[in-house]
Structure formats: C-alpha cells, structure tokens
C-alpha cells in the first residue's frame, strides 16, 4: 500500500484551525475549479525560500478561482517555531493571503501522505488528485528554477487538458513526525516516483 495519495484519489477532508482564527474544511473551497494543498511549515529553508513563490502563485491564480491552502503538520517538539504561535507570526510577517492551517494531530498529513515540506497536492473540481510533488526544481534558490511543474499542472487543469507531468518528487525537509527523530520517514514513504 502506498503511503502517499495516488493520482485519481479523492482529497481527504479536514477540519483545521487557521492562523486567522477560522476553522477550514474542504467545503470552504467548493467553488474552486482547482485546489492546491501544500504541506508547509515555518522552519524549513526550502519552505522559507519558496514563500515568495507561494505568495506569487496565490496572487496569480486566485483571480482565476484556484484555491490555495497551506497546512503545517510538523511536530512542534522538533522545532518550536513550527508551533501555532510561530505560524501566526510567520503569516503576519510574510503577509500570507491564503489559509495557513495547523494539523497538530498529524492526522491530515497521514491522510494525504505528506512526505516533505513543501509537498504540493493539486485536485481538480471533483477533488481528484491530478498532480503531486514539487512547485519547481529549485525551491531553495529563488530565481534559479528551470521547471515549473505546479504552474504547469494548474494551467493544464484550468484549460481542461491532461497534466503532462503529474508526479514529481517533492524537494524539501521531511515532515517532522511526533515521537520520531527529526529525519525519520516511514519506510513505505519512498514510493512517489
């Protein structure tokens, strides 16, 4: 059995608190023709160096109805900055316009099979998985990326085309699992590409 959601799988529902004081679920994005769910955090340099691109992606695609939501599932016992207070501070500091949600129980990370931060999951209007993996090929070095798989996938879905590259390996820090050492990953998690 695969650890990570497989192409064509339905988006698992969630009910998670956001840094804005609201609780969000899939229903909050029901009007979006495409939904992007990214597993993110506060401490990881791959995330930190991707935040401008996340903000730009949301700015470019929200006007086209694309939903974008970030979920932090990292155990704050590994990195205290990944706790809810750190999330609130980062969101305010960076000016996040998208929901930034806290998955303290890690149940949603397990349901999606999140491997790394950042790890993107793109769902069509029926909330079937059509792309999973990375945003681009160089999340740690802004301006040096040469591929843009997330944008390509979302563009394809908005234009009613098949996603040409539906699966890539996410590039980033591993999800920090409660009760495990900081570099631990489940053995079955090495199944994506």
Give the residues covered by each predicted segment.
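A short, charged, Gly/Pro-tolerant segment at domain boundaries
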Residues: 169-181
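Chalcogenol-based redox active-site neighborhoods
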Residues: 1-167, 181-183, 189-193
């Amino acid at each position: 059995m695969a650890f990570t959601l497989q192409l064509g799988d339905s988006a698992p529902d969630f009910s998670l608190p956001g840094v804005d004081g609201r609780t969000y679920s899939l229903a909050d994005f029901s009007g979006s023709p495409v939904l992007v769910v990214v597993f993110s955090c506060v401490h990881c340099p791959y995330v930190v160096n991707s935040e401008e691109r996340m903000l730009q992606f949301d700015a470019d695609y929200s006007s086209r109805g694309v939903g974008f939501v970030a979920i932090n599932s990292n155990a704050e016992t590994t990195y205290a900055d990944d706790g809810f207070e750190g999330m609130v501070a980062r969101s305010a500091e960076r000016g996040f316009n998208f929901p930034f949600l806290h998955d303290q129980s890690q149940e949603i990370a397990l349901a999606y099979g999140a491997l790394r931060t950042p790890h993107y999951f793109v769902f069509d209007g029926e909330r079937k998985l059509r792309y999973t993996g990375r945003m681009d090929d160089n999340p740690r070095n802004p301006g040096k990326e040469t591929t843009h798989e997330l944008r390509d996938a979302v563009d394809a879905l908005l234009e009613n085309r098949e996603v040409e590259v539906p699966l890539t390996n996410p590039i980033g820090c591993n999800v920090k699992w409660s009760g495990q050492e900081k570099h631990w990953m489940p053995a079955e998690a090495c199944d994506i590409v």
